Amino acid sequence: MRHGKAGRKLNRNSSARTALARAQATALLREGRIQTTLTKAKELRPYVEKIITTAKGGDLHARRLVAQDIHDNAVVRKVMDEVAPKYAERPGGYTRILRVGTRRGDGVTMALIELV
């Protein structure tokens, strides 16, 4: 039984799920919006929101914590210098998920996840 087991497996093992989350979070924070499946977008949202909330601390420790999840120094710099100050007064809810239809090949629901 799955009582109390939050999160989705996405047909991947734990290291592949972590790699997927990091890669998509990096892309989202670099570009501002990405298109992915609805399920992946729903998994990505809390991951990115925690990164932004951590970055709002603004100190060296916060930068190092963000760098643990985002392995691209340019994106870490952007998060610390541009994204976090933008949301300084906002207590959460930094992302929005919009459904954009279905994928032609397999009919899965696609979504656009973007920074508000």
UniProtKB/Swiss-Prot annotation:
The organism's place on the tree of life at top rank: Bacteria
Keyword Ribonucleoprotein included in the entry's annotation: yes
InterPro entries in UniProt: Ribosomal_bL17, Ribosomal_bL17_CS, Ribosomal_bL17_sf
Biological processes annotated in GO: translation
GO CC aspect terms: cytosolic large ribosomal subunit
GO MF term set: structural constituent of ribosome
Keyword match Repressor: no
Pfam families tied to this protein: Ribosomal_L17
Protein keywords: Ribonucleoprotein, Ribosomal protein
Protein family: Belongs to the bacterial ribosomal protein bL17 family.
HAMAP family in the cross-refs: Ribosomal_bL17 (MF_01368)
Assembly and interaction partners: Part of the 50S ribosomal subunit. Contacts protein L32.
Descriptive protein name: Large ribosomal subunit protein bL17
Lineage, highest ranks first: Bacteria, Thermotogati, Deinococcota, Deinococci, Deinococcales
Recorded name of the encoding gene: rplQ
